[in-house]
Amino acid sequence: TSLDHAIDMIEDVMIHIEIYQPQHITPEINQFLDLVEKSAEELLTAVRLLKTYKKSQKEIHVVIDRINACEKEGDLLYIHSMRDLYQSNADAVSIVILGKIYKSLEDCCDAFKDVTKFVEEIALKYA
């Protein structure tokens, strides 16, 4: 399911950081991690609201919109992070390592957006 995929993407991020052992955690990595954390918290809120869907329809859609906004922010962050990385004086190995970590974090943000589609399907089923 899409939820399994999102969890797998979080695990991939941890694996990439473990394998590549970046010299330091960049501000961009921290920004991505903030987006992932916010998306996870919002997803938990959406799932809890499903219990009272008839009363919470509008609120669920607001929460889904916030998750989608995090995904869009993740896309922009990825573009800016990669641009800045390629324009930096970093060595080739650091560019490859950070690029892979940034991509796995951006994929993680995408996966949460995919889960919102699943939440919407559940909500429609029980509407």
Residue ranges of model-derived segments:
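Cytosolic, long alpha-helical scaffolding segments
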Residues: T1-A127
